[in-house]
């Protein structure tokens, strides 16, 4: 599937890079 596009965390900001990198900050990631 689109696992590559889903690489970003749901609660994290995703950079518009290719491949997109997950900028995980403390946003309820418990």
Curated annotation (Swiss-Prot):
First and last residue of the signal peptide: none
UniProt GO MF annotations: serine-type endopeptidase inhibitor activity
Taxonomy, superkingdom: Eukaryota
S-S bridge residues: 9-24, 14-22
Protein keywords: Disulfide bond, Protease inhibitor, Serine protease inhibitor
Family listed: Belongs to the Bowman-Birk serine protease inhibitor family.
Protein name: Bowman-Birk type proteinase inhibitor 2
């Amino acid at each position: 599937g689109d696992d590559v596009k889903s690489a970003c965390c749901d609660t994290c900001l995703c950079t518009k890079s290719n491949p997109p990198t997950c900028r995980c900050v403390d946003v309820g990631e418990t």
